[in-house]
């Protein structure tokens, strides 16, 4: 048989009749032959790999072991496997590699790219989006942007969260988190809109997402919390739980004295 027939048979193609295909595969097994996927993909000019990048420009201490990332990565891996792709994960620190996105897509290692969160890399993603089409970003949509985004309506979610606090009786709100990242800024903006309409003040209790820093910062905020604050909107569920634990340690009644709500995608 020809090399092409052998190649198609080893790949399990139906173009080769079943008897011949089975015979070739049996011979390959008896000689310990394994199909070189890398060489096969090189010939077809595809890698069979989808890259997943998590840029941490706004908080380089944040860990991928965060429950949100782990859940999302699990679903991505399941879906990619079902479609015959492998997943290549990269944690990106933009301050150490400003050209990380161009370098990644130009490496030839992936057939497409998923970016989890825009962080402070919106403009860099926009620059690449004009020439690199197989890229999808999990994040916040802004009017007129070029890159394809999948995500929740963060501003609307922020409005819902603040409305819930106000309806529960809160009259002095605080946003717990960093308002610099695009998604968090939108959540805060939604909360501010509701606070303005309700005539209640809202302040920011800044907190990072990395576990150790968040614990220290949230504990400090709770220990020095203005007694008037009776409603806290946490930028993430993890921050909300951290805040709840800190309040409980001070024997502050939740939701009796302080109401808390978290946000996650």
Label for each model-derived stretch:
Residues 2, 48, 111, 170-173, ...:
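Short acidic/polar active-site loop segments enriched in Thr and Asp
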């Amino acid at each position: 048989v020809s090399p092409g027939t052998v190649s198609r048979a080893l790949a399990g193609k139906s173009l080769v009749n079943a008897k011949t295909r089975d015979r070739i595969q049996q011979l390959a097994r008896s000689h310990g032959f394994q199909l070189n996927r890398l060489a096969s993909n090189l010939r077809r000019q595809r890698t069979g790999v989808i890259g997943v990048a998590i840029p941490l420009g706004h908080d380089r201490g944040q860990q991928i072991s965060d429950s949100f990332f782990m859940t999302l990565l699990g679903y991505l891996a399941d879906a990619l496997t079902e479609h015959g792709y492998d997943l290549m994960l990269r944690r990106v620190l933009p301050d150490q590699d400003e050209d990380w996105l161009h370098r990644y897509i130009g490496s030839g290692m992936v057939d497409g790219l998923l970016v989890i969160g825009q962080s402070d890399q919106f403009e860099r993603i926009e620059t690449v989006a004009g020439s690199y089409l197989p890229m999808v970003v999990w994040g916040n949509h802004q009017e007129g942007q070029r890159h394809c985004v999948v995500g929740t309506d963060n501003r609307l979610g922020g409005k819902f969260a603040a409305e819930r606090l106000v309806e529960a009786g809160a009259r002095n709100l605080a946003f717990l988190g960093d308002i610099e990242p695009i998604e968090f800024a939108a959540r805060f903006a939604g909360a501010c809109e509701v606070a303005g309409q309700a005539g209640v003040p809202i302040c920011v209790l800044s907190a990072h997402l990395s576990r150790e820093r968040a614990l220290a910062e949230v504990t400090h905020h709770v220990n020095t919390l203005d007694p008037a604050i009776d409603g806290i909107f946490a930028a993430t569920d993890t921050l909300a739980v951290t805040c709840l634990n800190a309040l409980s340690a001070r024997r502050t009644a939740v939701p009796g004295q302080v109401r808390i709500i978290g946000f996650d995608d």
